[in-house]
UniProtKB/Swiss-Prot annotation:
The lineage of its organism: Archaea, Methanobacteriati, Methanobacteriota, Methanomada group, Methanococci. It comes from the Archaea. The keyword Transport does not apply. It is found in: Cell membrane. This is Uncharacterized protein MJ0419.
């Protein structure tokens, strides 16, 4: 009966899942009341902004017929990105001369540029799925196979991005129902749990693979909120970009060193990164702009499909993962900018057609 009721519900959207996951993080954490209230407010404000973005799409009145979507070109572009990503994955494994999945300590020897380029495989496959009519069962089979390939690099995030983005794309193409997306979500959680247990086993560490990570991440956020509120003055997000040019440490490493922790990187949560850089009030413009953009892009992607839906699927995944890790990688930031460019292109094309 519960599954039947689930199928009769409307579409589950990003802002729904964002608030739900944020609440889960709060439930499994032990942080100060003030920081908890701000964290919850951030997710609720994102929810409201996302809804406003959807409304804005209707107010502007995008005509998808004017966009002249060529799904074949989008498909070919996706295949090209997959090839580049596959070459990068192979090169990275050759570079490190080990398999980080089974030896997590070897992950620090991966080539940062190969690793970054390997993410194009995820983007390419998302675009291919969004631009083609491949059978649903084949897509899921290929996705599992590709997940095994990607997880060799030892990053759970990449596997999650692949699984979540494909699930979102199939769901918004109406190829899977509410009931099926629930089952798919459970499968993704089981895979995450398995990878987390494998990582702890390889490191010889004991503990709950899920709640211990949530508790640690939220405690870091709590420390930033109470002791480093606005202290970084934009340096965290500066590091997210310029660390790839060798000008500074990565954003998460900067946070770790500030807290006196060395040889590891630390995830500050998406809220913690913003507050650490710009102060508590910065969550209003940050989540306001992010929510409006993603709400608008969601409606555009759902109507147009192709590369629009492919990129939205990737942003869907990174936004949810960003609750813990923050949006602090240059390639991920570029995906958001690419999505923004697609939105601007659709708006300008409408204006020019008038």
């Amino acid at each position: 009966m519960l599954l039947l009721h689930w199928d009769n519900m409307g579409k589950i959207e990003l802002h729904h899942v964002f608030v739900m996951l944020s609440c889960i993080y709060l439930i499994f954490s032990d942080i100060s009341i003030n920081s908890a209230v701000v964290f919850l407010f951030s997710s609720i404000f994102f929810y409201i902004s996302f809804t406003a973005g959807k409304r804005l799409y209707y107010l502007i009145g995008i005509d998808k017929e004017n966009l002249k979507i060529n799904l074949k070109k989008h498909y070919n572009f996706g295949i090209f990105l997959m090839i580049v990503g596959l070459i990068a994955v192979t090169s990275d494994l050759i570079w490190v001369k080990d398999v980080p999945l089974f030896n997590p300590l070897s992950r620090k020897f991966l080539n940062v540029y190969f690793t970054t380029l390997s993410h194009l495989f995820l983007v390419g496959w998302a675009i291919v799925v969004a631009s083609s009519n491949i059978d649903k069962k084949k897509i899921l089979l290929y996705t599992i196979i590709f997940s095994i390939l990607i997880m060799l690099l030892g990053y759970r995030t990449n596997v999650l991005v692949l699984l979540i983005s494909v699930g979102a794309i199939l769901y918004y193409k109406n190829k899977i129902s509410n009931r099926e997306i629930l089952k798919y979500g459970i499968l993704v959680f089981v895979i995450l749990l398995g990878l987390s247990i494998l990582r702890l086993y390889a490191l010889g560490v004991e503990g709950n693979p899920i709640t211990s990570r949530i508790s640690l991440t939220m405690s870091i956020y709590d420390i930033i909120f109470n002791n480093f509120n606005g202290v970084f003055n934009g340096y965290i997000h500066y590091s997210a970009v310029f660390s790839y040019l060798g000008l500074c440490n990565g954003a998460r490493t900067v946070i770790a060193k500030t807290l006196g922790i060395y040889n590891v990187s630390i995830t500050p949560t998406i809220v913690g990164a913003v507050i650490g850089d710009y102060g508590t009030l910065a969550i209003i413009p940050y989540f306001g702009i992010l929510g409006i953009f993603l709400g608008f892009f969601y409606k555009l992607a759902k109507d147009v499909k192709g590369i629009y839906l492919g990129i939205y699927g990737i942003l869907f995944a990174y936004t949810l993962i960003g609750i813990e890790s923050g949006i602090l990688d240059i390639d991920v930031i570029l995906y958001y900018f690419f999505g923004l460019i697609l939105c601007i292109y659709a708006i300008l094309l409408r204006k020019l057609k008038r």
